[in-house]
Every structure is written in C-alpha cells, then in structure tokens.
Amino acid sequence: MSDYKSTLNLPETGFPMRGDLAKREPGMLARWTDDDLYGIIRAAKKGKKTFILHDGPPYANGSIHIGHSVNKILKDIIVKSKGLSGYDSPYVPGWDCHGLPIELKVEQEYGKPDEKFTAAEFRAKCREYAATQVDGQRKDFIRLGVLGDWSHPYLTMDFKTEANIIRALGKIIGNGHLHKGAKPVHWCVDCRSALAEAEVEYYDKTSPSIDVAFQAVDQDALKAKFGVSNVNGPISLVIWTTTPWTLPANRAISIAPDFDYALVQIDGQAVILAKDLVESVMQRIGVTDYTILGTVKGAELELLRFAHPFMGFDVPAILGDHVTLDAGTGAVHTAPGHGPDDYVIGQKYGLETANPVGPDGTYLPGTYPTLDGVNVFKANDIVVALLQEKGALLHVEKMQHSYPCCWRHKTPIIFRATPQWFVSMDQKGLRAQSLKEIKGVQWIPDWGQARIESMVANRPDWCISRQRTWGVPMSLFVHKDTEELHPRTLELMEEVAKRVEVDGIQAWWDLDAKEILGDEADQYVKVPDTLDVWFDSGSTHSSVVDVRPEFAGHAADMYLEGSDQHRGWFMSSLMISTAMKGKAPYRQVLTHGFTVDGQGRKMSKSIGNTVSPQDVMNKLGADILRLWVASTDYTGEMAVSDEILKRAADSYRRIRNTARFLLANLNGFDPAKDMVKPEEMVVLDRWAVGCAKAAQEDILKAYEAYDFHEVVQRLMRFCSVEMGSFYLDIIKDRQYTAKADSVARRSCQTALYHIAEALVRWMAPILSFTADEVWGYLPGEREKYVFTGEWYEGLFGLADSEAMNDAFWDELLKVRGEVNKVIEQARADKKVGGSLEAAVTLYTEPELAAKLTALGDELRFVLLTSGATVADYNDAPADAQQSEVLKGLKVALSKAEGEKCPRCWHYTQDVGKVAEHAEICGRCVSNVAGDGEKRKFA
C-alpha cells in the first residue's frame, strides 16, 4: 500500500503546545530588557495623542501581595490596550517613600534618633531602607510582565520630588488654604510625643465607668419639647463615660438625630436617656420605680444647653452620627481636644478644641483647683469624688475594657489636642470647588462618585502636619512671639525648595535660619513639622506629572487604585490639585475591589488563605495571573484560590491551542505571495474572517470601557465556539488534503492569517508573554514586537446582500448542531464510529432546503459527514429525528456507503477507480496528481 502521508499538508510549527510559562517568561523578560522594549514603544508612539495613566505609588515596605498584582496588571492592560488603540501611553511607576512604617523599621534596627544616632543619620538610614524595598518590589512588578519606565521610576524621596512637594504646599498657602489649629492625636506621656496608629497596641485596662447628669439650663424649654408640665425636680441629660479625667475638657453632649429620647421621672429628678436604653440604665443605677413622661427625636433637642457639673459653664446638645445604642445612655460626653470623633463633630459645630493636659500627662495650671498638676490617670478618682459632691453622679462601677497603649512603653496613652497645620475645606471654598470638580470626572464603577462626594461633603479640615523625622519638612518660619507665618513665606519656601532639590530634605534641618533670613533670624523659628505622607502622594500630579518630560505638560487621564483610595489617594490628590489649580487632577478614576479567597473570606496570614503572586508566577506563570485578573469582574471583590487559578489555566490552554492551530496551519504560507483576494476566497473563509471582525468590534469596545472580563469572555467564545467547534473543525479536511498551492487551501490560510493577526493583538494587553511568543512565529514581515503596533485593520466580512451572508451561516451552524446530536446518539448506540462513517439526509421545509442545496456537494464538508442529502420535510421516515431548534428540519442517519479513503478518511463509491492510485478516492487523486479540487463555499 502506498504511503500518502507525504502528500498531505500536515500542520507544523515550532510554537510549543505547552506554555511552560514559569520557565519561558524570564527569558522573554530578559529580551524585553536587553532590547529596551519600553523605549522602542515610546519611540514608535512619539507624536501620537497621549493617554496618561498616573501610577498611585505603593508604599516602599515589604514584598508585593496579590492586591498589588491586581492593581499593576489592570494598569498594564489599560496602558497596552491604549497603545494598540493608537495612543502614546507612557507609564511611569512610582513609590511612596517617607513616613512611619519605614521609620519603625529603622528604629527597630538602630533605635530612635538621639545624641549618639543623630536625626540626620536616621534619615539617611530611612532613605537607604526605602531604596532596598523599592528594588525588591520593582523586580516582582517587572516579573508580572508590566511594561514601564522601571529604570527611571518616580520616588517621593527623589530630591527633585521632595522640592516639588514643598512648592505644592507653597502654592496652597499662596491660595489662602492653610490655617493653624489644634487636633487630638494619640499621645504617649512617657515618649512625650504623638504616636501614629501603627505605634498603638491594645491591652485590657480597668477604668471607672460613670453615669453623669448635666442639668438643663432652661427647664421650661425642655418640658415644652416633651409636651409635659408636671415634672418632679430638675431635668438632666445623662452621659456615660469610662474616662472621667476628660470631663474638664467637655464642650458638648452628642445625641443621635433619629433616636427616640425619653424623659424619665425617677426619685426627685427627671433624666433624659435614649428610649431603647432606659431599662438597662435603670438597672445599672439601681432604680426600680420610674415613669416615662414623654419621648422626642434627638433632632428636637439640638442646641439646648446643659450645665457642666463642675466647670462653671454650660454646653450644647449637638447631633452626631457616632452615637450608638451599644452601651451607655445614648448621649455622649464630647471633648474635642480628647477624641477624634469628638474633634470632627466639634469642628462642625465650631466648638473649642480645649486641651487642659500638658505633654507629661498632667493638668495644666488653671484647669481646676483640685486637678492642676495631677496626672490624668490619677485624676479619675478626684473627678468622681467631685461629681459626687456636686450631686451629678448617678452611678460608678469598675469596668475592664480594651485600651490603647504605647507599643514601646506598653503604658496607656491619651488623646491630646496639639497645635497642627490644616488645609481648610471652607475658608477659601475648597470643599465647594472640589464637589464641583468631582462632577466633571468619570467614576468607574459609577458608585464611586457618590462615595467620594459624601466623603468630601462631610470631611473635616485636613491636618497635614506630622511630628516625625522621616518626611518632607513643611519648611515654614513662624514669628516666635505671634506664631504668625513670615510675610515672605512663599519666597522663603522657594529658597528652601532649591536647596532640597540639590541635597534632599536634610537641607532643611541643616539650614541655619540666618542664611536666608539674615537679621530677622532672631525673631523667627523653624517649624519642625513634616508633611503627612498623603500630602507627598497627593501632590504627585504636580511634583511628577507636571514635570516629567514624557507627559509633555498633559494632566493625567486616569487614576486607578483599590476602592479604599476614595478616602486615600483619590481624596488627597483632589484636595491638593483643587487647592493648587482649582481643578481635579484626573479625568477618569477607576477602582477595583479587594482580593478574597474562594469562599469570599478576607485574605489573612492567620487563616492561611493568602495567595502569593510570586508562588503563582513560579508555578503557573505570570500570564495565568494576568488572565485571572482580566477575567474577574474587578468592580466587586476578586476571588482567588488554587482552584480559580486552575480554571484560568484551563482557559489559557484553550486560547493557546487556538493560536497553535492557526500557526501550525500557516506552515509554508507567505502573505506577500500566497494571500488570496477576498472576492476569490471560499465563502466560509470570508465568514470566518467576518467572525473575527465582529469579535474585534466587541473586544475593542470592551477594552475601551475597561471591561476586561468581557474581553476574555468574547475571546473565549471566539476561540471555543466560532473557531474551535465549527470553523477549525470543518477546514481540517481542505487544509490537509487539498493541493498545497491551490486556491482552496490558500484561501483557508489567508483567513487563518487574518485571524491570527487580529487574535495576537487582542491577547497582547492581557496575555503579554504568550502574544509576544505567538508574534515571533507569525509569517510575513513585521515589527519586532506586537506592542509597537495597533489593532489589526485587515479584517473584512460578508455583505448582508450576499445570499450566503452571516445569517445564512448562523442557520447552518444550527443545522450542524442538530446533525451532531444525531451522530452522537448513533455513536452511543454503536451504529457509527466517527462522523465520517455517517451519511445524513436532511428533511426540510422549502426555504431551508434552498439554502442547503445551494452548497451542493460541499454541504457534507460543513457537516463533517461522508454524505449529505436534502429531501422534502413531508417525506421524512418515522425514525428521522425532529429538530428542537429548527422546526422545519428532521435528520435521518445511515452508514455511509462505499469504502474509506485512507488519505482523506471519507467513505466514497469511487475509491480505487483510478488505476495509478488504486487505494484513494477520486477527489484525493485530483489533489495528488491532477489540478486539485475546486471549493467555492466550504
């Protein structure tokens, strides 16, 4: 028997079946770096319209986690897709380098700055530590396949950036937004310094828990509110607290606007309590005989005044969202100098931020005769005795509760108001302008707008000063007597900024005031405060975007971060940009959800459900991680687990196999000389290119809308359904058995070529490594990298006016689906083995019959059977299968007649009819020794 294998056009490619991504990707990365791929892209895109995605800087501390990966991959997908859409989209990654976590790391190793270890040395160590952290994170970000200017990132600790941060503050001061005030901060009396949240630990502590009566100033007004006239004794509003020592600083009582408050008659007096807490308070204070005289909503009591039990002044009732019914009385003692909630509500009502406590934790002189000079924790008993003496104490008991302590000394800390600098929300209309700017920004998802609007509408002034060592100095001089800013502040700040640009922030601490103030130096002091790190990152629109040459003076188009950044970077950037320039720093803001495990639980080391991006890249490869990110709806929580990643790997295989099929069947195809003109192509091939065109329209629309899971779904549908289960199946016969250089085969290869050119580009933003690999195997002249080009423009489709248009092939797909069902059943019943052992008769209504007969003998190729006949629907035998999808179709199957051709595997009556080729069918003889078969339709 002759061997006809050599006469077949079998698929052949060097593109491997297995991705082996974990092994191959590092080599590709090395090539990208050696070639300076990022630089090549910039050169290719020069002069095109820009799209600037400004990188929100991650903090330079610790290894990257899965959330970082999601963030950087989403950014990279956008930047690459914008490049393919014809934009110049430079990406400059950044890092946030100042602040407390870095200070703590340095402190753990070297101790706090003191005489032996100077503040200058401390800062140098912080700078060194941050640089090593940046290097570690940069390696991992690059490994993700993220393209950017990794050799020239922006760091908030770059000297030039530090100088520009000072300039940003200068502009805000020039525009009149800065003011000085007091704000409560965590304060350790042993450190004699403010603590950040990260330096606070919680331990159990026993404190006195007290209920205190504040007597109403206008008793009649209260009776009127409750609609009662007969009350026995004075009326008081009752507060509950576990910090009696803060009562000297009380300036109000907070109640909830929507709670019901009851006026309760007890022995000799009446008290006001939240109605839902009356029973528990009565039990606590040991009263069994009481009567509720009336109730009102909290809002009714707003601004009524109550006498402080011992300080000799009265205070208002105010409305606050922080009031709860979890414990206490429903009325909260409010001391703006001693608590963050109290401070925020105090700002709203214009209350004094009183702070009667010194840095050592003792009361300042003039606070109260029996309290002056007393340590606050020793003062609790004195205050309780004082309340008892004044008849204001309803109840006292000891209570154990969780209390904030200093992480160094393990001793209890206090909240204490200290002088700070603020960006005012209202003195120059910053709040109103910010709210206006928010409306001009596109928020993705759109609920982001309402979220940031409510935050801006309700936020207090922004405290931008910090008492830290490692941070950008505020660079201010204040008069030592009046504490007023120097009249030439803006000029002086520019002078400092110039020095910082050369020597970094240390230049400020090394600066002798005389150098720039001359004779005035004796009258002024340098402000020792540093800026809140949120000011560093929030001013990058000015300190980085406005000055980097690749951004060419354009503002950022997009900020993209996790949903926690509405109150973080999106907010600080909006405040600073609006305060400096009167406008938002971004046109679009996209937020993604947090990562959770497969069961929707938050990731935590203690549960052991974290997924390390490094592990995923080392086992599965970065492209699998990228595909998982793209295929997950980022608008909500993003679930990730081994099982979910395995599903991503399965999808990846489907896409890779499709690409490999295309490449293997483009073997021997040179687009410059083998391409068939559209009008000469087989109709089915034009349909397939049209499918790619339709898919491309959907995919580009989805990229444009940042709907990446839609991109992946459409890509999968194209690979699996339109190509895999229909077109690629049908063309194997023609591709393998037709004459190598025949129009029938070259038409098919032309379609595959167009499809591959489009597919590789659709993949590129998401499956960057695989797209680069595919690109290297595609035939024809091309640029070195897929990333320098644009979406493929060579696609075309069938015209609606043609008889065999898209609707025709859609119907044929359905017919084929129905035939497949019948074949599957016959295989299950052992009537046939493969589909080529079958011949089918399609009994149809006239309209469908006309379409099917138009294909002539080529119908069998579409159905993958050896025979296909069309007959009248009414002639169908009883055993013909009625289609559930197409009402006018019944399918009957029989075993194909004739012999199996060993070359094409079809069963035909003409095997062996040509003496020279006695083993193969007539069609194969024509393809091997004649002019080759002609195909018009399929």
UniProtKB/Swiss-Prot annotation:
Modified residues (N6-acetyllysine): K183
Catalysis performed (reactions): tRNA(Ile) + L-isoleucine + ATP = L-isoleucyl-tRNA(Ile) + AMP + diphosphate
Claim: Ribosomal protein is one of the keywords in the record: no
Residue ranges annotated as motif 'KMSKS' region: 602-606
An MF annotation (GO) of this entry: isoleucine-tRNA ligase activity
Its EC number(s): 6.1.1.5
Cofactor(s) the protein requires to work: Zn(2+)
Record motif 'HIGH' region, residues: 58-68
Note on cofactor: Binds 1 zinc ion per subunit.
UniProt: ATP binding residues: K605
Entry keywords, A to Z: Acetylation, Aminoacyl-tRNA synthetase, ATP-binding, Cytoplasm, Ligase, Metal-binding, Nucleotide-binding, Protein biosynthesis, Zinc
InterPro entries in the record: aa-tRNA-synth_I_CS (IPR001412), aa-tRNA-synth_Ia (IPR002300), Anticodon_Ile_BEm (IPR033708), Ile-tRNA-ligase (IPR002301), Ile-tRNA-ligase_type1 (IPR023585), Ile-tRNA_ligase (IPR050081), M/V/L/I-tRNA-synth_anticd-bd (IPR013155), Rossmann-like_a/b/a_fold (IPR014729)
GO CC terms in record: cytosol
Leading EC class: ligase
Sequence positions that bind L-isoleucyl-5'-AMP: E561
PROSITE patterns to which the protein is assigned, alphabetical: AA_TRNA_LIGASE_I
Chief location: cytoplasm
Chain's role: Catalyzes the attachment of isoleucine to tRNA(Ile). As IleRS can inadvertently accommodate and process structurally similar amino acids such as valine, to avoid such errors it has two additional distinct tRNA(Ile)-dependent editing activities. One activity is designated as 'pretransfer' editing and involves the hydrolysis of activated Val-AMP. The other activity is designated 'posttransfer' editing and involves deacylation of mischarged Val-tRNA(Ile).
Domain notes: IleRS has two distinct active sites: one for aminoacylation and one for editing. The misactivated valine is translocated from the active site to the editing site, which sterically excludes the correctly activated isoleucine. The single editing site contains two valyl binding pockets, one specific for each substrate (Val-AMP or Val-tRNA(Ile)).
Complex formation: Monomer.
Family label: Belongs to the class-I aminoacyl-tRNA synthetase family. IleS type 1 subfamily.
Name this protein carries in UniProt: Isoleucine--tRNA ligase
Organism: Escherichia coli O157:H7
